[in-house]
Amino acid sequence: MAFSASLFRTKTVHTEDALCPRSAIQAEQPPNIIDCIPVAGYEAALVTNALFLLVLFVFNPLTCKGNWIKAILFYSLLLYNMILAIFLVIDTQHFVSALLLAYVVTFLILWTADRVRLSCAVGSVLPFVDMRSSYIRVDNGNSSVVVPMNHTKHWFIRNFEQSCHCENCFYIHSSSYVECTFISRLKKSILVSVCDFSLGGNVSTVFVPSSDKTVPLHIIAPSKLYV
């Protein structure tokens, strides 16, 4: 229903019909006649935005595929509002369309600036298709790879069984590291190997931030590591 163009087509009504606010009255028309979009159109747009935003805030996937779906939902919301704003411009609803365009453009600028900054930091376009904001970048001398992380703590444990089935995840857990870096919105830390331990027949390595100071280390050995 919210995607039906008929909901947003203007209708000419008498002012006493109260289908839309009086601010929509056009100067060239008689005082008792107005062109407006029915209230149902605005309600549909608000409900659609509310549902999309609710899903984006509540949906917190642990896997790469889930985060790609979340990114698609986000871009779909921006596209929906952009198309709606263009449709309102065509129907001469300039005030409402201007507000909607300002909302979309402002949101898009802030999002793009954040993603560009992260992309430059990690050296990959992955932040544009993955909604997470913490990444591990590893370099084995011949090549490097970036893997998004669910947690915001700058530590990393490799060689655990994990539910992420991306090729990058398997690469990062089998690679011999030359450099390992944790990158997020607020910090960029070089990680160093501090200890190895055996779990389920697999030898795992703990990485923590490189620091001259004492680094608190708390290891809880899970059966799975989500990345």
UniProtKB/Swiss-Prot annotation:
Q: Which InterPro entries match?
A: a/bCoV_VIROPORIN_3A-like_CD (IPR046446), a/bCoV_VIROPORIN_3A-like_TM (IPR046445), MERS-CoV-like_ORF5 (IPR044323)
Q: Which domain of life is it from?
A: Viruses
Has the keyword Hydrolase been applied to this entry? Answer: no
Q: Where is the signal peptide?
A: none
A single GO CC term for this protein reads: membrane
| Residue span, CoV 3a-like viroporin CD domain | 134-191
Q: Which residues form the CoV 3a-like viroporin TM domain?
A: 27-130
| Cell location | Host membrane
Q: Which UniProt keywords apply?
A: Host membrane, Membrane, Transmembrane, Transmembrane helix
Transmembrane stretches, start-end = 39-59, 71-91, 93-113
Q: Which membrane topology term applies here?
A: Multi-pass membrane protein
Protein name per Swiss-Prot or TrEMBL: Non-structural protein 3d
